[in-house]
């Protein structure tokens, strides 16, 4: 006889990065604490530290449906209900001020850790149920919801685990086959933002150095692209 106690929630959010944590906080407010957040790492928002070159690129000045693919009508409706201004106001209410630089939105501290600290404190103040080092290996669809790892039942699931781009942060695509078995469809994933490899002997001493500069790419004598940053 199996006497294992199954914990029940209204909603389970899988993935405790920026999107997952913010989503869980807002849902927890709306559903009176009936939300759990499942994160495989030993701390929340682990990947945020790498965004914006360590400065935390929260958002951009211009955010609209033209920057998304897929169901444009859905994106437009979502952005109408929760706009970029809504996000900035949320952080302001949490005590985090922001600044704009070249169309990008950063915390005024220019430290990605500020974002992590604010979101973690907000989650704690809202008594959000957070399960760290929780690795989701199985999801079963049941009559009135979903069973996760045969021990957590929830009526709804929100998946915020990213793609396959950063395995060292836990973003390795492990949930994709599980979600496919549930009938979810995925487009093929390809590397889109990758490094350029060069001979390192002449630039080795520049490692870690940050400098405002222009960089131009040429194909022979033909200028292909110039980037400032």
Predicted feature locations:
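Glycine-rich FAD pyrophosphate-binding loop
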Residues: 12-14, 28-53
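Glycine-rich active-site loop/strand segments that organize a redox cofactor
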Residues: 52-102
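Short glycine/serine/threonine-rich phosphate/pyrophosphate-binding segments
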Residues: 20-23, 161
